[in-house]
Structures are given as C-alpha cells and as structure tokens.
From Swiss-Prot:
Localization (cell): Secreted; Nematocyst
Claim: Disulfide bond is one of the keywords in the record: yes
Stated family: Belongs to the sea anemone sodium channel inhibitory toxin family. Type I subfamily.
UniProt protein name: Delta-actitoxin-Aeq2b 2
Propeptide: 20-26
Signal peptide per UniProt: 1-19
Domain of life where this protein originates: Eukaryota
Protein source organism: Actinia equina
Record InterPro entries: Myo_ane_neurotoxin_sf
UniProt keywords, alphabetically: Cleavage on pair of basic residues, Disulfide bond, Ion channel impairing toxin, Nematocyst, Neurotoxin, Secreted, Signal, Toxin, Voltage-gated sodium channel impairing toxin
UniProt feature coiled coil, ranges: none
Function: Binds specifically to voltage-gated sodium channels (Nav), thereby delaying their inactivation during signal transduction. Causes death to crabs.
C-alpha cells in the first residue's frame, strides 16, 4: 500500500512538473483562487492554476508566461495565472 501511494504521488508530481512543455498547459493542475477573483456574494471564480514548485521555474514557482496571483505562497505550490 505504501509503495502504491509513493508511485501515485511520483506520477502526479512528474505530470505537473512537466506540464509547461504541454500544449494544453492551462488544462493541467488544480484551480485556485487569485486575488483578482475577489470575494463575491454568489461565490468566487477560480481563475488560477495551482503549480508545484520545481527547479526549472522562476523564483515565483510559476512557468514561463505565467505570474503569481495568490494571496500567500505555498510551501510546495503557488497559484499562478496566465
């Protein structure tokens, strides 16, 4: 069971880490709340994408052409927007 969890985690990590080479880059990752989304009375739009921090990205943890848009930085990931 532990080996299966490690393999699944590794597969997800590698898929997200190599996502900047993908054509459909905006369709990968998990939606997140950007500061520009703001509080709305009927719920918020999640316009950002959660990116895992890897060595190939800039200091903000976002791929090329994207910028950090969250309220605070995560330890393993950042909320980025194109």
């Amino acid at each position: 069971m532990n080996r299966l969890m490690i393999l699944v985690f590794a597969a997800v990590f590698l898929a997200l880490a190599s996502a900047d080479e993908d054509v459909d880059i905006a369709k990968r990752g998990v939606p997140c709340l950007c500061v520009s989304d703001g509080p709305r009375p009927r719920g918020n739009n999640l316009s950002g994408i959660m990116w895992m921090k890897t060595g190939g990205y800039g200091g903000n943890g976002c791929p090329k052409g994207w910028h950090f848009c969250g309220k605070s930085r995560g330890f393993f990931s950042d909320c980025c927007k194109r």
